[in-house]
Amino acid sequence: MAKAIPKIGSRKKVRIGLRRNARFSLRKSARRITKGVIHVQASFNNTIITVTDPQGRVVFWSSAGTCGFKSSRKASPYAGQRTAVDAIRTVGLQRAEVMVKGAGSGRDAALRAIAKSGVRLSCIRDVTPMPHNGCRPPKKRRL
């Protein structure tokens, strides 16, 4: 009897032995820079911190979700603080500007963590978009 020829595009899933949190091990190592810009985007559901070089190229980013927080805990101030510490420690910044956007609860905690981390801040700028009577806001929640 002839052997069956294996299909090239078989859909069989092969587990290679990656850990459950494979995202952390597959992430590229961040470039080390001394001067940069820290963008803090604090929404009501999450806090995202992006570190860029002075030209605006993204070097590293971190969010409360990638730091291990799930669901409503992503919106906590502690999650914002941990996210900021994670981003700064990985890149190794010495001097930075901070751009803050949004009104979430992780905003002030992230700013406090950046200030305590030892990074010299040249300026802190609030770049939250403010409408000049633009789109209609969502209706009030009734609980």
Swiss-Prot record:
It is found in: Plastid, Chloroplast. The keyword Ribonucleoprotein applies. One of its GO terms (molecular function) is rRNA binding. Keywords: Chloroplast, Plastid, Ribonucleoprotein, Ribosomal protein, RNA-binding, rRNA-binding. InterPro entries: Ribosomal_uS11 (IPR001971), Ribosomal_uS11_CS (IPR018102), Ribosomal_uS11_sf (IPR036967). The keyword Plastid applies. GO terms for cellular component: chloroplast; ribonucleoprotein complex; ribosome. GO terms for biological process: translation. Belongs to the universal ribosomal protein uS11 family. HAMAP family: Ribosomal_uS11 (MF_01310). Part of the 30S ribosomal subunit. This is Small ribosomal subunit protein uS11c. It comes from Triticum aestivum (Wheat).
